[in-house]
């Protein structure tokens, strides 16, 4: 039987699609419900649940992002188990959150032998570091190779140079 949360969410998606607009991002309470389903996924819904935690929760400092980052950090650190997300996948997803609540867990994971490289990959494309740049620098100064790689990546602006090249021309319509 489909959970009430998934039924409501799918009705919302259908309603918004009929209007030609995307579904709204998940709220913090909805993200909490999604996490409960991730812990014990209904058969046949596994891919949909992973897609939702990956793409339907806003990044940054939104309340839902805080719930998502907290759960992914717990999975990455091993204090929570998720049959659909390995610690490496949880760390990878933290790396896609652009900044905010994901930064501290990613910096902590730089010290993890198994996940440090994954955390570094996420931090290399994250610019919204705020005051935590110094935490990465301190780790690099103490010999953490993953932190050093992050600093080198930022220094070489790989977050920018790794992006696809813009086309030679872009056709636009300007309305006055």
Residue ranges and their predicted role:
Residues 43, 80-85, 100, 112-117, ...:
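Alpha-helix N-cap/helix-start positions at coil->helix boundaries
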Residues 45-49, 86-90, 119-123, 147-155:
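Conserved hydrophobic register position within alpha-solenoid helical repeats
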Residues 2-35, 40:
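Amphipathic alpha-helical packing elements
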Residues 50-57, 95, 111, 124, ...:
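Structural signature of alpha-helical solenoid repeat scaffolds
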Residues 43-56, 62-70:
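Short, charged early-sequence alpha-helical segments and their helix-coil boundaries
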Residues 6-9, 138-176:
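Eukaryotic acidic, Ser/Thr-rich intrinsically disordered low-complexity regions
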Residues 21-25, 42-44, 61, 79-83:
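Charged, low-complexity interaction regions
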Residues 28-35, 59-78, 97-111, 128-140, ...:
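Amphipathic alpha-helical scaffolding segments comprising HEAT/armadillo-like alpha-solenoid repeats
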